[in-house]
Curated annotation (Swiss-Prot):
Native source organism of the sequence: Arabidopsis thaliana (Mouse-ear cress)
Keyword set, alphabetical order: Chloroplast, Isomerase, Plastid, Rotamase, Thylakoid, Transit peptide
Family per similarity comment: Belongs to the FKBP-type PPIase family.
Name by which UniProt lists this protein: Peptidyl-prolyl cis-trans isomerase FKBP16-4, chloroplastic
Domain PPIase FKBP-type: 123-217
């Protein structure tokens, strides 16, 4: 009687003893994904990549160290800039209203930092970062989200508040700023959410805006975010 024996490899091979196999790619069907821009679609093909040849533990440690060092260098620049901006805003928020400049329309502003770039005038297409606060509590901001420094700039044309496309206080507050500047604006109710209020903001509420002018462009820049509700 002849016995046939099969050799079964254990499931827990170490990385160093695994048998390398060449990478293979399996292409799947394309799918469509909607993009932020209206009416814009892009066909994206996905690929399923099977595991390549195993890498030794030592090699993985070296690679991981390099990746962490690179990521740390990239993130530190954006993070340092964001911290510097928020610190300036915090110091300015403690200033008395008497230090602010009052415009005829009731808007009050204080330039935390005066930029040295182009000036935003009516008709300029601008990109800004903003933080909107009510009684010191942030209720809306463009700084929160993805990206190295966090958030996505908000782009709009100065003067569009007349059409209801942008909050009046933000529109009027950015006018006269220069690229690279940061401004704290106290917005009266009539230039904010008026007698109706919006969500957690009550009627006749005065709000504050921390605005940083990033650039002035001739082409669209930033992601439009509706900050006028109702």
């Amino acid at each position: 009687m002849i016995l046939t024996m099969k050799l079964v490899h254990p499931l827990h091979h170490s990385l160093s003893s695994s048998i390398p196999f060449p990478s293979r790619k399996r292409q799947s069907k394309p799918y469509r994904c909607s993009l932020p821009s209206p009416g814009c679609e892009k066909v994206i093909r996905t690929e399923t990549v099977l595991p390549p040849a195993p890498v030794s533990c030592e090699g993985r440690r070296v690679l991981l160290g390099c990746l962490l060092a690179t990521a740390s260098g990239i993130l530190s620049t954006g993070s340092a800039e964001a911290v510097s901006t928020s610190r300036r805003a915090l110091r300015a928020s403690k200033l008395p209203e008497s230090d602010f400049t009052t415009l005829p329309n009731g808007l009050k502003y204080y330039d935390i930092k005066v930029g040295n770039g182009a000036e935003a005038v009516k008709g300029s297409r601008v990109a800004v970062h903003y933080v909107a606060k009510w009684k010191g509590i942030t209720f809306m901001t463009s700084r929160q989200g993805l990206g190295v420094g966090g958030g996505t700039p908000y782009g709009f044309d100065v003067g569009q508040s007349e059409r209801g496309n942008v909050l009046k206080g933000l529109d009027l507050g950015v006018e006269g700023m220069r690229v690279g500047g940061q401004r704290l604006v106290i917005v009266p109710p009539e230039l904010a959410y008026g007698k109706k209020g919006v969500q957690e903001i009550p009627p006749n509420a005065t709000i504050e805006l921390d605005i940083e002018l990033l650039s002035i462009k001739q082409s669209p820049f930033g992601t439009p975010v509706k900050i006028v509700e109702g």
